[in-house]
C-alpha cells in the first residue's frame, strides 16, 4: 500500500512538472536592438539577438544570444505581471545617462520576466535617477 501511494505521488509530481514545463515553454524571440546595452554584468553591442526561456527547478532563466552565435549568456529572472497586458512583445530598459540596462522581457501577454539588477546598475542608480523605456516589437519585427 505504501509503495503504491509513493508511486502515485511520484507520477502526480512528474505530471505536474511536465505540464508546467510544457506550458511555460515559449517561442524564442529574435529582435534587433539598435544600441549597446547592459545585460547582467555584460555590455553587449547593438545587433540582432535571440531571447529564449529555459525552465529550471528554481525559476526561469532567459537565454540571450547574438544572432551570429558569438555571445551567449543566461540571465536569472523573476516573474512580473501587468494589469493591462502587453499586446506586442517588448524589451524594457532602464536608462541612466547613455547607459541602458535590460530590465524586463515581455512576450506579448500579462506575465513577463524581470531581470535582477546587476551590481553596476545598483551602483549607478544610487546617485542618478534613471528613466525606463520599452523597445516594442511589432509583429513584423519579431522573428520566430
Residue ranges of predicted features:
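Short N-terminal segments immediately surrounding and downstream of signal-peptide cleavage
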Residues: 26-42
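Sec/Tat signal peptide C-region and signal peptidase I cleavage site
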Residues: 19-24
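Bacterial N-terminal signal peptides that target proteins for export
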Residues: 1-9
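Short polybasic amphipathic segments
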Residues: 35, 60-65, 102-105
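A short tyrosine-centered beta-strand micro-motif
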Residues: 47-51
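Short, solvent-exposed cationic patches
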Residues: 11, 58-76
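Beta-strand-rich cores of mature extracytoplasmic or soluble domains
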Residues: 77-144
Amino acid at each position: 500500500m505504501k509503495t503504491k501511494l509513493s508511486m502515485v505521488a511520484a507520477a502526480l509530481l512528474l505530471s505536474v512538472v511536465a505540464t508546467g514545463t510544457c506550458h511555460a515553454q515559449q517561442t524564442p524571440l529574435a529582435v534587433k536592438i539598435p544600441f549597446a546595452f547592459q545585460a547582467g554584468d555584460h555590455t553587449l553591442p547593438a545587433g540582432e539577438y535571440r531571447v529564449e526561456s529555459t525552465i529550471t527547478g528554481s525559476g526561469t532563466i532567459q537565454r540571450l544570444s547574438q544572432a551570429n552565435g558569438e555571445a551567449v549568456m543566461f540571465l536569472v529572472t523573476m516573474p512580473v505581471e501587468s494589469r493591462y497586458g502587453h499586446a506586442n512583445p517588448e524589451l524594457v530598459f532602464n536608462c541612466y545617462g547613455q547607459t541602458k540596462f535590460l530590465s524586463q522581457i515581455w512576450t506579448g501577454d500579462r506575465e513577463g520576466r524581470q531581470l535582477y539588477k546587476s551590481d553596476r546598475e545598483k551602483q549607478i542608480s544610487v546617485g542618478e535617477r534613471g528613466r525606463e523605456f520599452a523597445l516594442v516589437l511589432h509583429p513584423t519585427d519579431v522573428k520566430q
